[in-house]
Amino acid sequence: LRSLAKTNLPSGVPVKELHFQLSGNMNRYVWSINGRTLSETDRIMIREGQNVRIILTNNTMMRHPMHLHGHFFRLVNRHGDFSPLKFTVDIQPMATQVIEFNAAEKTRGNWFFHCHILYHMMSGMGRIFTYEDSPPNPQLPHPRQALQHVYAMDRKWYLTVNNDFASNGNIGDLEFGGTRWSIQGEWQTGYKETRGYEAEARLGRYIGEKQWLYPYIGMDWTYRKGEAGERNMFRQTTRKDRELDGTLGTRYTLPLLLVADARIDTDGKVRLQLERDDIPLTSRLRLSFSLNTDRDYSCLLYTSDAADE
């Protein structure tokens, strides 16, 4: 794109340069800038009259149409002085784009910069530019409460539940969590007493920009009739006839979306586990599996409906 007229910003004024890494986790629907959501950062202070240059780098696998309220910015490209003016720029995956604008809004105030994909914005991919020495806004008699209302978007917690009913029992899992903290649960129950049951609960926090690491504390309940004294692969005895233990561990997402889980319980027993959900075998056929050093194995083959495609 090329502008019909020169779009140079004023010269001889201070320049504020910002580097924004567009980041996120596609599996958890968490989107951020520089690894932090809107509510996890302070407003960006700018001065009236200065030039603001933003270097945007998209490190995700999705495109992000980044939109700035209240200002047109220069989309810096090979046309130099004739770079076009825009208020939204679509950043392609693994691409870098430089934009710049002059902070010339006479009313000053607060201006939102965010991804224009709605759920990306609501999960935290945005920043607020605030002019220094802005006069009070008569439409916002309580500015702090108003700001908290904006921050509430990416502070929400969501509940997801899956349960598979089989001929001899059911297997399920749930998660109730937000951007960082998460409560997770898993269970396997049989319809007959001889099948027993097993349930786990975890409270943990996702660490890092990609959120691959999840350290946690939790509880484990196990009952299987007639299986007292079974040994795991580390030659440690497990009391599966009736057992309630606290656990401390960590989960890590590996390549191919495999999840490795390492934990130790209050009896000193160690368990290593590898699992993967929703492996696409065909357009409708899916596979999930789990195996661990307690000699527990599960494999689930199922079909997905058209709504999942």
Predicted regions and their residues:
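Copper-binding active sites and cupredoxin-like electron-transfer domains
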Residues: 1-159, 163, 169-171
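Outer-membrane beta-barrel proteins
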Residues: 8, 42-44, 89, 151-153, ...
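A structural motif
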Residues: 23, 249-252
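A generic beta-sheet turn/junction motif
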Residues: 24, 59, 165-167, 176-180, ...
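Transmembrane beta-strands of outer-membrane beta-barrel proteins
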Residues: 159-163, 183-185, 213-217, 258-262, ...
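Solvent-exposed loop/turn segments connecting transmembrane beta-strands
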Residues: 162-171, 188-199, 209, 221-228, ...
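Outer-membrane beta-barrel channels and translocator barrels
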Residues: 179-181, 206-212, 253-257, 279-284
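Conserved small/polar residues in nucleotide/adenosyl-binding loops
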Residues: 302-309
